């Protein structure tokens, strides 16, 4: 080992004492990825080392920070896992799940077109991951085989959330980004767009899986754009009847006519041989964070951590050595428990009572008898309803709805200011005996001086039907979600 290499190794050891650094897995213009072993658990991880000065010079600071923030929020078996982020003045160290195999792109290049059963297996996992993102109001915006990895068991891991963005209900994205061959018509046309762009990209990926080629391809990029905007492509004769039905519905130029994820889940081609764990949507992120497994806690205690410290850290979503160990042990157990059906054991136990996006949205009655639909990031099954809604729908009168809202805010000690006829700004300080009185588990919170600011707007969707929208303005996102849960309970929705 020369002097420079020894110096680099010593630097990594001092910054990352909990990891044994191994070989370089890859490198790029502003980062390199190292294989490492988490010493306490013995599990392998990948550590992405990002150079701050190079990131700044390339003008991608926002992209990098966006990906870090989004991946911290996501927990899904088919989305790459981020365990911790360690920052120094010169570098950012992102500890991530280690995926052994490679890109889906290379797999397609090597094998050519796949048999429909194999393509379906991969596509089902991709849709599950994308659905989870959309449920959490995240649009990937750059889905392509290069951004989909395969693990050692040929299971999907969606990566590269640098171009992703967080959607707010009632708002559309306008930034034109993503890879030309996979970009939706509304993106390349510069029109406002929503999560339907990911459906289009998934359609292109499905075409590539089944055909071994891209539907929209040309040496000349303007020609590619023209084909995309006109929806010009050819379906090979070898495709089955149901595959020939599904692909055109995903590659619909008009996004309002494009098939939704709910409809994809109901499609005969998708449903064929659908694994149990994929037939049940995973817990929402807020519920996942609250779910603490005793068996894993004990494993973490066995390697030297204090039990109360582990539980408190998990309950308050604190990143530290204990929580990193917990999630590494949990994820590796889930991946290895059922080799041919990853995470089945985890999802099987929550199958009863879970809100399934493939089922009709259930009506729930509030205290005053108004009927609300819990639409947390899910599309309705109503055929003519093509909007992406986050909120509560009601058929009550606006006056009655606002009266119930004011009662709920008062009970939760939330201050508000009226800024429009059916529009209010709210402010809540976490300093009251909130968790104890409003059924959120006591262990999930330590009272801290946290301020949450949000806006409530009542929209008229159609005659006699109204949508209540809640938009976070400022404050920690997870705590805001907790507050929303308490608010919904006050309204009688949960």
Swiss-Prot record:
Region listing for Regulatory domain (RD), in residue ranges: 293-494
Protein's recorded name: SNF1-related protein kinase catalytic subunit alpha KIN12
Maturation and modification: Autophosphorylated.
Keyword Kinase appears in the UniProt entry: yes
EC number per UniProt: 2.7.11.1
Domain-related comment: The regulatory domain (RD) contains the auto-inhibitory domain (AID) that inhibits kinase activity of the protein kinase domain (KD).
Organism: Arabidopsis thaliana (Mouse-ear cress)
Modification type Phosphothreonine: residues: 175
Assigned keywords, A-Z: ATP-binding, Kinase, Nucleotide-binding, Phosphoprotein, Serine/threonine-protein kinase, Transferase
InterPro entries, A to Z: KA1/Ssp2_C, KA1_dom, Kinase-like_dom_sf, Prot_kinase_dom, Protein_kinase_ATP_BS, Ser/Thr_kinase_AS, UBA
